[in-house]
């Protein structure tokens, strides 16, 4: 099974069926965004990620479906998600199971931080 996994993007060559089974396919990609819920999403931001994914897939149309090409798409999406975070369209989930500031420390006013330690830097 071909796949690409980054911190916030999982892409699989195949589909998930109604009974929650995965069926590998060479003609369909499945995208899972932020599977660990590290970020706080709104519908508009998610739609931007899905639209960017569709654009990237279209750019690769006609090329071989390889792990390398999937990684390029996943990496580009990861950078796109980082840009959404930096623009304030999404935010870190400070109540998440495992806070990991993999895209840089949160940019929020200190008075809004309750029970969280964020080093000055």
Swiss-Prot record:
InterPro entries: NdhM (IPR018922). It is a peripheral membrane protein. Pfam families: NdhM. One of its GO terms (cellular component) is plasma membrane-derived thylakoid membrane. One of its GO terms (molecular function) is quinone binding. It catalyses: a plastoquinone + NADH + (n+1) H(+)(in) = a plastoquinol + NAD(+) + n H(+)(out); a plastoquinone + NADPH + (n+1) H(+)(in) = a plastoquinol + NADP(+) + n H(+)(out). The keyword Thylakoid applies. It is found in: Cellular thylakoid membrane. Its EC number is 7.1.1.-. Keywords: Membrane, NAD, NADP, Plastoquinone, Quinone, Thylakoid, Translocase, Transport. Its main location: membrane. NDH-1 shuttles electrons from an unknown electron donor, via FMN and iron-sulfur (Fe-S) centers, to quinones in the respiratory and/or the photosynthetic chain. The immediate electron acceptor for the enzyme in this species is believed to be plastoquinone. Couples the redox reaction to proton translocation, and thus conserves the redox energy in a proton gradient. Cyanobacterial NDH-1 also plays a role in inorganic carbon-concentration. Belongs to the complex I NdhM subunit family. NDH-1 can be composed of about 15 different subunits; different subcomplexes with different compositions have been identified which probably have different functions. This is NAD(P)H-quinone oxidoreductase subunit M. It comes from Synechococcus sp. (strain JA-3-3Ab). The lineage of its organism: Bacteria, Bacillati, Cyanobacteriota, Cyanophyceae, Synechococcales.
């Amino acid at each position: 099974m071909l796949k690409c996994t980054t911190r916030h993007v999982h892409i699989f060559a195949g589909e998930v069926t109604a009974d929650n089974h995965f069926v590998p396919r060479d003609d369909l990609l499945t995208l899972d965004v932020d599977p660990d819920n590290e970020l706080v999403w709104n519908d508009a931001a998610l739609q931007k990620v899905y639209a960017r994914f569709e654009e990237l897939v279209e750019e690769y149309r006609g090329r071989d479906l390889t792990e390398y090409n999937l990684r390029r798409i996943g990496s580009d999406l990861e950078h796109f998600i980082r840009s959404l975070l930096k623009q304030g369209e999404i935010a870190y989930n400070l109540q998440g199971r495992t806070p990991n500031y993999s895209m840089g420390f949160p940019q929020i006013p200190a008075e809004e931080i309750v029970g969280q330690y964020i080093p000055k830097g």
